[in-house]
Amino acid sequence: MTATEAEAEAALEPQPQPQPQSQSQSQSQSQAVPDPGDAAFDLAERFGTPLFVYDFDAIEARVRSLQAVLPPVVDLAFALKANPALAVVHWLGRLGLGADVASGGELATALRAGIAPARIVLTGPGTRDDELRLAVSGGIRAITIESPSALDRLERIVAVDGRREPVPILLRASTAAAPWRRDDGGGLAIDDGSGKFGMDPDDLRMCARLATASSHLDLLGLHAFGWSNVLDADVLADHVETTVDAAIELARMLGTPLRLVDGGGGLGIPYGPTEPTLDLARFGERLRGIVAGWADGPLTRDTRLLLEPGRYLVGPAGRYLARVVDTKTLAGRPTIVLDGGIHHLLRPTLVGHEHGLWLRRRRSVDDGRFHDRRDPRPTTVAGPLCTGLDVLGRDVPLPAASPGDLVEIGDVGAYGFTESMPLFLSHPMPAEVAVRDGCAELIRPGLDPESWLEVQRIPSW
């Protein structure tokens, strides 16, 4: 059920911070965050470590910079898979974005965050019947169909539901062999030819004809997406152009205009100093050229282009704080062991992204300096897990560390905590904090392993 605006605001009220074994008690009201030197320590002492911190001002700045270059025909839907934190989704909704959800849980999150159903699209393969029913009853903007069998299931669900209004849908095209795919775009393959995403042309055309003839379904348009974290504006624009061309061809075949073209996401951010920054101005220029004349063809002046950015908006706005619990020298190399690791931040190990990593110390009372950078040495930064995979950084140039220091890791606002494995080895789960206008608020408390034990049962036999 859709939360009212008041309910959404209430859901974001700060809560008292529990006291898990490795986290300190938090205050519930907003407080100013000092800047620059001791900010990390003040956050760590107030909310405990490990800790995820999201800069809402940075999120807003990235949203505004993207909106500024896009043609008016473009709508933005935040991809919740990047960061489904309720407060983050709510903030992006206040900034004018809709939501791209890929599960019933993400749909519930978007609704609770106050996103209007008319601005939500459900995408993703393997959508269950209960998720389809939730989307139908919620009256969302569109449900993406990825196979003929999914179309048939949705048709039956709508028929049983007895709705008078047809349910809006998008058809997803496979991009495994798309001509815009290039190996030099700096992205990660989503649709890699595995047969999981979208439909081949024959199945897509068949589904289009069936949907057009159905009294239960309303074919809005076409969806295609196959590449993530692209850093080349022309690669992104080529994909959108190919998707628009495919929508025009489909509309001509059906003899009816399409009202929505969904180009997916894929806007990337650089991980590490050697990666380029996405040229937003170039991307916007290409998009304006692509949509300039489509109202003269089988698309109409009312046709919208939907993009689903996620990582680009929130990735650089997040940082992860963990405390140094031990130091040692192994084979002549300094090693730092933290109270957090890949159970909270798996992506650096999973895909090899090079996140910025810094050692933070309290400002020295004696000399007034913060974070003495003299004599850095290649250092291994590891977590507390009993696996050799739990390494967050290798050969990181850092000065000598001491227990109690902090390590800060940047660019973790997307695909951070929720993509990791927080239950492995039963360590406490980190809290999440939002910072805006110099004030920090708890948006999700840390969770103690005891909470996981409370929902488990020992069988009677």
Name these PLM-found stretches.
Residues R286, T300-W461:
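Charged (often Lys/Glu-rich) extended helix/loop segments that serve as interaction or gating elements
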Residues I59, K81, S103, A135, ...:
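Conserved, mostly hydrophobic/aromatic
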Residues G104-G105, P148, W227, G266, ...:
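Short, ordered loop/turn segments at secondary-structure junctions
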Residues M1-V167, S214, D218, V435-W461:
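A charged N-terminal "starter" segment
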Residues G126-T127, P148-A150, A159, S174-A178, ...:
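Short acidic/polar capping segments at secondary-structure boundaries
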Residues D38, Y54-A61, N83, S149, ...:
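Conserved active-site and cofactor/substrate-binding residues in soluble primary-metabolism enzymes
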Residues A3, E9, T175-D326, L425-H427:
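Active-site loop/helix belt of alpha/beta enzymes
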